[in-house]
Amino acid sequence: MNKKMFPKIYYYDQDFIDIYNKSLSWIQDKVILQKVADRGKKDKNYYSENCDYIDQMQACMSSFFLVYSNGEYSSTSAIDKFYQLQEESGAIRARYDNNNAIIDLDENEENIGFPIFAWAEYNLYHKTGNKKRISEVLPILDKYYKWIESKFLKENGLYSIDVNKIFYKNSPRVDAYYPIDFNSLQVHNAYCISKLADILNDKNLSLEYKKRFFSLKVKINSLMWSEKDGFYYDLDVNENILEIKTIVGFFPMLSEIPSEDRIERMIFYLKSTNHFGTPNPFPTLSVSEPGFSEDGNGYYGSVYTYMNFFVIKGLEYCGRANIAREFTIRHLYYILDTLMPFNKIKGHIWEAYRPMQEGPAYFDSNKKTYTEKGLICYLALFSISLMIENIIGLTISLPDKTVYWNIPTLEIMGIESLSLKKNQTTIICNKGKRGWEIKMESEKLYYFTINILNKKEKTLPIPSGRCSMLLDKL
């Protein structure tokens, strides 16, 4: 495989470069070509972990790393397949087979998935700058949101859905009637739709979703937050707080729901070894809970990589990039230790891992059954997306023509052949004879903001061609 389809990364730990490169090869096996009617057009490809069906969660999540493939792999084709199957009511189901038939999921009557399409689109816009796409998908997202609203919004202003039957099997959240995760993701859904409407200067739609965003945000903060514990909880059918600390209590960080004071109180739990700060972060259930299992046992303690992605991005969005980086590195090391153990016997990629030591988590400890094996999509969220954005520390906004680089430590790191639409860019930090310097190469002008060790931040226009800057001079 030609790895130049994706950017080349530089990092001082060769193991991280290796897992990045291996992920690129594994992705190739998951990309499916679909023939197009027009012979003059290139065959479109889409990402799918399974050849027999497409999955909404994986379609959306894969867009976060496929967007870095320099256009070789489509980051939108899998998502578009779901849009094409939207029903008149606005419904989009979680899974479809190859004949576009809905796949009925156990006890999921509406076959709903997590409402994350708008989040994927907002991220894609900043990576591709494709404004035309926003105008095409915004009506779809609007109808989808209102379908969810019509089905699951209750009179108290919160959403009710049985997450245990629909999303989480073998979970301690048995009495959750108003789940904090689904409500938080729906807030983020409204937030992203309002932002997309702003891009199109659709003031009416933007205002409509800002109202939805603030209304649900207020409900979550007033009903689902425990001031005593400093944590967000599920509610039971009578709107009573269920004092079971689970990883989804951190999902509100995705959309500016908690205040600064609340964020600090929540981060305490992420750092605490008595709660979620296990050697391999983050378990789905707090260590302090009676049902916590070191073997994982489904959502009683397993470390699910896709759930970690939500938490890491929440920390980043709340301005906690350095903490997000630390946790990303720790989890990625445990993935590496499971994939390449010291006994030299080849390991595997798993859906979930143990919190206290390397190795896959049990889905059911009593039956000794493991979580799903070989899910490359969730690995690539860490080994590609978070590798570029949180470990190396690059945040890209193509519409703004900006690259923000948070350099947390002076080590060799950077990226080569990063595609900013039609602008190939290289940014590498290295130590030369004159000291630490950043070497850059670009085909077009862009604006570069650098944050050095969280002490100094500076924005500079970077012209086309090659240039370098000494960090000491900054």
Curated annotation (Swiss-Prot):
Keyword list, A-Z: Membrane, Transmembrane, Transmembrane helix
Major place of residence: membrane
Listed InterPro entries: 6-hairpin_glycosidase_sf, 6hp_glycosidase-like_sf, Glyco_hydro_37, MGH1-like_GH
GO CC terms: membrane
Topology versus the membrane: Single-pass membrane protein
Localization (cell): Membrane
Database matches in SUPFAM superfamilies: Six-hairpin glycosidases
One MF annotation (Gene Ontology) recorded for this entry: alpha,alpha-trehalase activity
Transmembrane segments: 374-398
BP term (GO), one: trehalose catabolic process
Protein name: Uncharacterized protein BB_0381
Source organism of the structure: Borreliella burgdorferi (strain ATCC 35210 / DSM 4680 / CIP 102532 / B31)
Taxonomic lineage from the root: Bacteria, Pseudomonadati, Spirochaetota, Spirochaetia, Spirochaetales
